[in-house]
Swiss-Prot record:
GO CC term (a single one): cytoplasm
Cofactors that this protein relies on: FAD
UniProt keyword list: Cytoplasm, FAD, Flavoprotein, Methyltransferase, Multifunctional enzyme, Oxidoreductase, S-adenosyl-L-methionine, Transferase, tRNA processing
EC number: 2.1.1.61, 1.5.-.-
Species per Swiss-Prot/TrEMBL record: Leptothrix cholodnii (strain ATCC 51168 / LMG 8142 / SP-6)
Reactions the enzyme catalyzes: 5-aminomethyl-2-thiouridine(34) in tRNA + S-adenosyl-L-methionine = 5-methylaminomethyl-2-thiouridine(34) in tRNA + S-adenosyl-L-homocysteine + H(+)
Function: Catalyzes the last two steps in the biosynthesis of 5-methylaminomethyl-2-thiouridine (mnm(5)s(2)U) at the wobble position (U34) in tRNA. Catalyzes the FAD-dependent demodification of cmnm(5)s(2)U34 to nm(5)s(2)U34, followed by the transfer of a methyl group from S-adenosyl-L-methionine to nm(5)s(2)U34, to form mnm(5)s(2)U34.
GO MF annotation: an example: tRNA (5-methylaminomethyl-2-thiouridylate)(34)-methyltransferase activity
Name this protein carries in UniProt: tRNA 5-methylaminomethyl-2-thiouridine biosynthesis bifunctional protein MnmC
Stored PANTHER family: GLYCINE OXIDASE, SARCOSINE DEHYDROGENASE-RELATED
Gene: mnmC
Region (FAD-dependent cmnm(5)s(2)U34 oxidoreductase): 253-655
Family membership: In the N-terminal section; belongs to the methyltransferase superfamily. tRNA (mnm(5)s(2)U34)-methyltransferase family.
The keyword Cytoplasm is assigned to this record: yes
Amino acid sequence: MRRSNPITPARLGRSAEGLPFSEDFGAPYHPSAGALAQAEQVFLRGTDLPARWAGQARHVILETGFGLGHNFLATWAAWRRDPRRCERLVYLAIDKHPPAPADLADVHRDSPLADLAAQLIAAWPLATPDLHLLDFEGGRVQLMLALGDIHDVLPGLQAEAHSLYLDGFVPARNPAMWSADVFKRIARLAAPGAMAASGHADSAVRDGLVRQGFEVRATGADATVARYAPRFQPEPPRGWRWPHAAAREALVIGGGLAGCAVAQALALQGWRSTVIDRQAGPAQETSGNAGGLMHGIFNAPDSPHARWFRAAAMHTARNAAAGLAAGELAGTLAGFLRLDERLNTTQAEAQLSAVGLPRAWLAWLDVAGARAAAGLELPCGAWHYGAAGWLDPAGYSRWMLQSAGDSARWIGGTGVAALRGPRDGAADHHGGWQAIDRHGRVIASAPVLVLANALDAARLLPAHCPPPGLSAVRGQVTRIPAGTPGLRPPRLTVAGQGYALRLDNGDVLVGATTQDEPVGIDGAALRLADQQRNLQRAAGLGVLDATAAEFGTTLLPGRAGWRAVTADRLPLVGPPIDLAQLAQARGGRVRLDAHRHQPRCVDDRSGLYLCTGLGSRGITSAALAGRLLAAWVSGAPAPVDADLRNALDPARLSK
């Protein structure tokens, strides 16, 4: 797995002419004629935009150096003005040294695109080595900002770009940006017929493009224009053949966090979905607790777990921000404390420095600082996560489903007894999947099917797919009423051995127990022993007096349910394994590119996907898992790099 490198913000100055100047590369960001003029004349005109995106469902632009954002803003403005614009504009940009928010605001202070610049600045992410998803225009314009060295970022991108903005400081100042390897990897991401434009006419730019199959159409004193026309175009890997591209409809089985997140994400890609659940309303099972934690994970190696949950937490914070601000969601993301009794301040700071994450995302608090932040007599120091805390999972699920608008249809109170798929001879008008009720009637049909129904996904998988390897883990939470003698509500959500969060009405939710236990009717009943364990842990956090933790035989409000947990504690997102393809792959000749051809259920006869196994961190994972699933289904650029996509891919179970 790729190890993340710390992100160093740009060192911005001014040239003698007053132009924004990079202290890192010793060059101005744009020519004296102006950044927006260069964007219009070199990049938009050079790639024949906006004409080439007319009538497209999605147009993807790859920019190799985001800089100060002028090219993005000019392209966004052109999209806004164009009555024949594409349905969705995806702008995938890379930057090694992103500007600090204050510098970005200063550069665009008097911009003629002040409205768009203000939106960009308001959405500007923390400088972490991740792929940041910033949505504008209701999701119809998406900036995917990949922060990191281009040599680290390009190998992990999964996209098909129609236009290429080859921007960056001149080859003499930044030769690594214009290396043969960079051009090779850019060509891998280029769609047939993609247009490339650069503000440089150096031989390094021209020759690099020609060697990778580009036809250089025009060069000038300060520009290069080329078209991608390779003599050989490799066949896409099996896992990237999305079925029925013309019929953008999907069935989603399961209306909890995962299913509602999938519906929201599919809607952002222009897909319609039908969400089916056995309960009358969304999130009535394990996703129905009054509150749950939302936070990232940190470790010094910056492992796949840490990278996934950091990216997922940042995306969830952005996704839920509008609902929280409008009072449509219960919860708060004002901060979260994770106790760690193993570390002292010196050790914690050494770990943090090794990864180089910004302190606004993660900081270490010694015991005094942790106690002051939580308002509790905590036993040790803690990691403080900035944009983290708790959300109401049921309310969040409903909010995501509602945000999909007319693109999502809800069918509740209806159990799916069986599925009928392409291999079973389903004969609906799409030739795809049918959900069948217990009477043998068709509930709904679509060319694509997503199983987002937690543990129940195994029951519905076709015979040619192995079980997904999910374990049932029972958990119980306890709700302590406000005003209970000895109760001290935490100022911030806190977790250690157990967790405690203050609900909006002053009640405190504590939990949660963890028991490997099969799903059963009796298990849904609250257990006094589990409540006692929760209260004792709350006392250990300082939320309850030790004597108040003994409630005898009084059963407090609470909830019990089962989590769907994978062995590696990462979700399952993507097509399930196809056993027939797996046997063929293991028994036949080994291909040199076998790693690109996983035995997945994505072909002309399938269109089956999983989004399950979110475990105890469903609130954190759901939204980004939904976006990843939607990328699988629609062919949109993946919202995470290849390593993380592979870490969540159900095909990992075939190894």
